[in-house]
Amino acid sequence: TGEHAPGVQAPLRDTFEMAHNALKAHGKAVQMLRAYGKQKLSIGFAPTASMCYPETESAEDIEAARKALFSLPDDPHNWTWNVSWWSDPVFFGKYPEEGLQKYEKYLPKITDDDMKLISEPIDIYGQNIYNGQCIRMGKDGHPEYVRRYEGFPKTAIDWPVTPECLNWGPRFLYERYKTPIYITENGMSCHDVV
């Protein structure tokens, strides 16, 4: 979007290529750490994404939240905060099929060697969790985003305050990726005086 430094708005195809190269760099870093580490290392990966949590603890709402978390948006300009696009290649050695179909015309050439490199085994999964979306099962059987009420708590930079995502996010991530989860970033911006 160009909102953050360096203020560049890259073409969509370039953003997918950048992401793919970042994942390849991650895989290469894992190889180098394993090859040259002087002791046994615990190596991880820490992307960031918006989590989803269920409106109620009904089985339907829980399944809807899980599905929403790992689904890819239809809008190709809104893929960057997605859990499965960044994490499935690392843990499963492949991009999500849903994303390959939705974003096909923007993707770089992806080789088997790329995916082997990207999926170098890791020991822990970090996730930067700041907020999330409340989800319920819609009447049509598809996940539905629950609209926030007027006056919903927000941080100083207008991020929603959603502590529920600190429970449900790691739970869903562990179910899918079967790797110890670390919350590597969390917090909220306030107008504090020290």
What are these regions (language model features)?
Residues T1-V194:
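Active-site region of glycoside hydrolase catalytic domains
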